């Protein structure tokens, strides 16, 4: 292939939209039917055939359950995912053993959720490179195990007896990709994490204005159980004890206390993808016996007229303590956090538990008030909505991406999990998930990784941008890319560099700049072509002369 043909081919490749025949192009986030794909059954058959062929490694027209299962698990979709359970069940024989299935059988099974399976196979879920994320999460988990500072909560007798060595980390993305490490199926009480759902339930039932006539939305700057109200005689926000008692009083006040509790527990179950939330009666009784401060807060709010008329204070406090005593495990809380990250829709069931505006309000207050009197520091260093509880639970929400639960009973002086805070620090150090990371990661290279991007996507885009700018003679863009950290001599799959393209197109200023950067003047592409041969073949004599001058040995060297 001659140099002009190579140059034309390369320009066509870098101009082609990603996903349309390019070897490394990034596919769109959601599969879309292309213009040339027939509509109706024929188009659907093409999608099913593409999926089937990706599993059929030995090309014998049959695939096994294990081929499908391993691919889905690698992408983060687990066998108990309700969206794919029907398909996985159909892949087993009558005796439960895996079976070989044909294309037609696969099509009958996959049609129950073909879009999800297709996105998983193509790497187009919320976190495309899920194995890399899970590897990092597992490493962070192992680094947390030796951390033993802090102490378990001792003002609630039952919590005092919890094993302080327990540790769990669980992750769930907005597409339902899941991973967990450690004691992720050990149940623990929600405690203050329950305040998030009580607030959301009150908002969905009464609306923002009505709820905030009874509770403020400013950080208190004080301890979570401080005997203090704002200047209007209202609790400062729904994330402190006084505020949570208030929002609890607003949840279905027309029902008796048993039905009100059932609604709260059922809501947690919906958020967690249908997994049943438990109740720790021992913790409830233990906390009820030591609830003098909460009673004092309740009487103080009643005296200031903060409650709606007719509130039964005794029943409200009982209801509040019951909500705190609901039990979940780390895997459930991660799914619940992912539901909040997904605008109130559970990723596993697609159940719209809360409205998007309700979740927006909740995440706003979690950002400013969710970590007790450490909330400001957490917002500054971590920059994500979170809610902690004295049981050692920490629910972290990355809006639009994932939810994370860290559970470790040892607490710091603020009442937050020591290991939970340390995990969050490690996470934001490794990934650009801080709310303001876009201000820094978009300007030059960074050690942080973007979990939303495909493996090698950044490097691919850098090569495309540099070679395209060089071919067009856009010297300012080439300079900007090099200044941001892009290696000027980087090559594409064919071994073509920016210098090849600039020489082939006669872009003398770009060639001169790349050479001044120390770029190799004679890189060889897969066809044996060099920048000099490209310039000569395309008749760019000025560029060819410059390259010969650079390649020609100095007179002293020639004499030797």
Predicted regions and their residues:
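Amphipathic regulatory helices of Ca2+-sensor modules
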Residues: 62-79, 102-114
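Primarily EF-hand calcium-binding motifs
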Residues: 43-60, 80-100
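Active-site-adjacent helix/loop patches that line small-molecule binding or acyl-intermediate pockets
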Residues: 120-142, 149, 202-323, 339
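Structured C-terminal helix/loop/strand segments within mature extracytoplasmic catalytic/sensor domains
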Residues: 59, 68, 342-461, 465-468, ...
